[in-house]
Amino acid sequence: MGKNIVVLGAQWGDEGKGKIVDLLTERAKYVVRYQGGHNAGHTLISKGKKTVLHLIPSGILRNNTINIIGNGVVLEPHALIKEIKELEMQGVPVRNRLLLSAACPLILPYHVALDNEREKARGSKAIGTTGRGIGPAYEDKVARRALRLGDLFNQITFESQLKEVIEYHNFQLVHYYKAEPVHYQRVVESIWGIADILKNMVIDVTQVLSQAREKAENLLFEGAQGTFLDIDHGTYPYVTSSNTTAGSVATGAGFGPLYIDYILGIVKAYSTRVGAGPFPTELNDETGNFLRDKGHEYGATTGRSRRTGWLDAVSLRQAIQMNSLSGLCMTKLDVLDGLKTVKICVRYKRTDGTETMSTPITSAEWAEVEPIYEALPGWKESTFGIKEKSQLPQTALNYIKRVEELTGVPVDIISTGPDREETIILRHPFDEMIKK
């Protein structure tokens, strides 16, 4: 019987999802992206060879895996073609392994222009977007004026709709932001060659996944970003423009929620965040710099340095509840090697002196909380590359056990290095049929 699992980030993104998805795809027939866009950056390392993906699912390097980009993903066609060609130069037959939903909203030049002009206008209050047009593209989708991938294949209708939408957005660009307009003809000329390349990959994703499930194939749904960047449940407004929680598998891939067997939350052994927004356990000190440097905490998409801090069990518990996580995968355990003391945030303290074990909702409430830490002994021994739980230092095992106690969820996978082989699998998601 086939199993259907979801892999998603339980923090603010950059948890190491790409490596874990790449590892688990050995057992998956289909790997599906269901939200986000090319603002994601998933890094895969196998036998020392590094591959960075932004749009294409992380199963693309596997010979027998079919990779799908679902309708919940906003698609920048030029970025997709670039990624396809880069992989093909490495000998990966992408066009034989990749399928696309006809319902994917397109990211077009006016979305990028709006994204950048808005960030400029915000000044010191900038959200810290990647500037790739993700938010404006989702806005058009909700406003029912988006051009979708399937629209590309009817030239007359597409050009008519495109002209109308460009006029709409140019009014804002020119008259509000005092910026240059986007030229209709240039957009048209740049898009038509791409339509021919992508046409044979376009499918009805819901039907393909339904047939795969009926054939008892293993399906893996790959999330982008992280739980606390969710447009509804994240640290709003410092969030992305899509739903990053497990529920978006249903809306972003057309796959019924009752068919999901296991949901794996990826969590670093510490915390990181890119860009502005609340981060209660942030460390602006020597320890923070240690975590950043040793963990190579620089974005795969933007190259920006990440903010670093201790593991936050308060937000992690919230992520477990929102996503109904079956188990956790703890990544970058090896980064904590050598620290005399490691800390976990177990509660928040408000400015009025009261304590809470819940995450705030508003920005004002987030600004008022401070972390209450529990300190545990660190370990001097190296955990890098360890593949057996029995080889881990006892203090590292105690740290993992304490995380399990604080969250009520087992740590099923431990990552001790960037390569897919540098992993301890205690319970394989495809071996379990757990529903919560």
UniProtKB/Swiss-Prot annotation:
**GO BP, sorted A to Z:** 'de novo' AMP biosynthetic process; IMP metabolic process
**Residues engaged in binding GTP:** 13-19, 41-43, 306, 332-334, 415-417
Q: Which reaction does it catalyse?
A: IMP + L-aspartate + GTP = N(6)-(1,2-dicarboxyethyl)-AMP + GDP + phosphate + 2 H(+)
Provide the residue positions that the database annotates as binding Mg(2+): D14, G41
Keywords in alphabetical order, please. Cytoplasm, GTP-binding, Ligase, Magnesium, Metal-binding, Nucleotide-binding, Purine biosynthesis
- Sites binding substrate sit at A300, T301, T302, G303, R304, S305, R306
> Does the keyword Metal-binding belong to this entry?
yes
Recorded GO molecular functions are:
adenylosuccinate synthase activity; GTP binding; magnesium ion binding
Family named by the database record: Belongs to the adenylosuccinate synthetase family.
What protein name is recorded for this chain?
Adenylosuccinate synthetase
